[in-house]
């Protein structure tokens, strides 16, 4: 019931953004959700936080015009944030409560402050809160997943090389180079597969 949104001060949008043929993400469900909720919250200050993965500049070019058109308000009279999650399949609950970081792309400081306080009530570790503008957050989300994909592929490449060389041990090589603080040990194991709803499509989009 979209009308219940008027009872809240913040709305988090977690809807699917399917990949299109060109690699970009389709925001049709996201835009539809905004058009359904906005009429019920346009009379007061409200924070709209998008969790779904989007193509960079989506909030500026597609979402912001919808908010302004339906509410008749400009930025500052509402808060718009990009607040993507970084979760792994099979480890979702733990990733929510013990994240490596919280990323907040904010339209204004007020919205960012409120969103930060909400997260502090949820997570149970001392994860850093990275606050930036919206476009940098949009880029960072897919860049992070693309980098992890690249690292997995590199680990598998090490495995292929070690299989072709007598005495080669992929685990030993990964342990050695992973000791370097510039590289790290995570996702370097040979034979690691990648999949799920994020890595493949985010790599293509990037």
Where are these regions (language model features)?
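Structural/interface elements that position substrates and couple domains in central-metabolism enzymes
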Residues: 1-206
